[in-house]
Amino acid sequence: MKMMKRIVVVVALAACGVSGVKAQTGATPPKVPAGTIIEPGKSLDGLLKIYEDEIMGAVNAMPADKYDFAPSPAIFKAEQGVKYETVRTFGAMVAHIAQANYYFFSTLGGAKPDVDMKAVGNLTSKEDTVKALTGSFAYAHKQLATLTAANAFASVKDDQTKTSMAAFGIAHMCDHYGQLVEYLRMNGIVPPASQK
């Protein structure tokens, strides 16, 4: 019996060593077995990272001189009733995503945003909007780290919980990511996520 325990310990330690080497070499980390309980913040943070990478790829792919690009009013049919003045430029959309990130993830509690969210909405240059967006993602990651099994479903506004607000924030990004992709393609740019 002692010998069996030693064998199990040696095999377990060897497996840990292999996992560590794979992690250091950039290999795919081991999959989490089905049924494993994962903290809500960690789970949502992984999803946020996926969309952050896609969005940051898109905003970095658009040249600075195209940040004022918006689709031409000519592409809209009169019967659609589109109010063209409400169509955002690429840069305005990037600033809007940053503002929304600060709003949605501030509802999780923890640190309040240390930026003027209204001022973020007025940014126009690529450099400024990308910097604001990068900051908003860093803030979102910090806020998600405060989400635990104990507080994940605490209400924050009416019937909205911390988790539903975080999920809404991520869903909001997905919506605008689709628009960013269309704007890139209208300018002959293949989105980085589509190049993989």
Language model features by range: what are they?
Residues 25-38:
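N-terminal pre-domain segments of enzymes
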Residues 25, 41, 45, 49, ...:
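Short, contiguous alpha-helical
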Residues 8-17:
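Bacterial N-terminal signal peptides
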Residues 63-67, 109, 145, 149-152:
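Short, flexible helix-adjacent loops and helix caps
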Residues 1-9:
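Bacterial N-terminal signal peptides that target proteins for export
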Residues 50, 54-57, 61, 139-146, ...:
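Solvent-exposed, charged/polar functional surfaces in cytosolic regulatory/catalytic domains
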